[in-house]
Amino acid sequence: MSDATKQKAIRKLETMSVKIGYPDEWPESMDMMQVTPISEGGSLLSNMLVNMQVSIEDSLQKLGDEVDRSLWGMTPQTINAYYDPANNEIVFPAAILQSPFYNPDAEDAVNIGAIGFVIAHEISHAFDANGSKYDEYGNYNEWWTQEETQKYNELSQSIVDYYSK
């Protein structure tokens, strides 16, 4: 990477936001979600279809609105984490903050190794083939030079080739 691109990468890392645990507020669309029990004629499919419709209608109503950066892409009960390039943020739902990823009774080294790996993994997505196409504000902006992108793609392909044997 050129020095100029490295500086942009550092700026992107420094401006990255972090969400941990759960959102401060639930989206209003969550209040419209519903589950009809099987005993009342509901089914997994019918419940999924009704709630997908609610989600689609909610998304359509937001078209043209300013991006709500407070929204989460996962529920707190989800044992996962993610990097969102459009918001330049990493998100750690509450459920991942338990063993084996985090244990308040464990040695610091154990937690650093476990949850630290997850954190580093998510940060790395800010600079992978997809994340590198978004700037520190979450705008689609290819800030790597063509040569840097080509070199990255070549190195990535060499790893794919090596592990595909």
Residue ranges and their predicted role:
Residues 1-165:
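Intrinsically disordered, low-complexity linker/terminal regions across diverse proteins
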